[in-house]
Amino acid sequence: MRTLILFLCCFLTTTLMLGQNTVGTLRNDLGSYDAYTLLSPINSTETYLLNNCGQVVHQWTSTYTPGASVYLLENGNLLRTGKIANNNFQFGGVGGKIELFDWDNNLIWEYTYTDSTYTQHHDIYPLPNGNILMIVATVMTEAEALQAGRNPANLTQGEVFNEQILEIQPFGTNQANVVWEWNIKDHLVQDFDATKDNFGVVADNPNRLDFNYINATNATANWLHCNSLQYNPALDQLVLSSRIMSEIYIIDHSTTTAEAATSTGGTYGKGGDFLYRWGNKAAYDKGTSSNQTLFGQHYPHWIADG
């Protein structure tokens, strides 16, 4: 009898231990979406694929802590960003490294894109053709900013960051070709300096960004802080999110790089100008804070039809 009781105690203890939640607070309602969750903790070099029970289904290991983007591709490969510290770009979301792992955790391609005057940051996006879109911050010097009509009072750090979108075509194990490019600095308007080419009435140019609109920042170099980039293959359009502007922008991806630097060309005839923007009408002199609809948003994305 004593042996039986001891056995039952051991069995119940083991059962309780196995039944305990070892991965933190867990909620899995009947109506929850039946899918996996991809997680890359900010202070870890690990990436986890979890099921709805909180169990680790698969795991990848990098030598870099994450940037701010990770994707599980249809073929089972893992595409992620890694963080490389850059003293010239000190803001949340800095990456600088892109890595591609196969299902068995083999690193099959990597690409470094960070230097003293530029860095990949926040989001990337895998395109259907195998190319990769990425957000890049590049330095506009004080002279370049003034030439573009920046008010000197809005140059508190002596420079500003241009936000750039690059489409790269990976090859080899650590290389890529840039096959398409878009820059916000090509699509600015300002009403401060009438001697500059981009001088105009801000309210009459909602398809361009007011270079002197300062929102939720003290005119620092990081005046836009774009944090998300997504692609719609049916429309061949991009949606770009600016946390500091509290706006999202729709951009034509069908343009050539040359057209993307202008206001003409592409499927929609607008070049690289905004096709649509939403979130903060005050940013283009069409509203005030009373009718602002976005506030420091992250990760807008396209919703499938239906």
List PLM regions with ranges:
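Bacterial Sec-dependent N-terminal signal peptides
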Residues: 1-22
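Histidine-/acidic-rich catalytic cores in large beta-rich domains
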Residues: 20-306
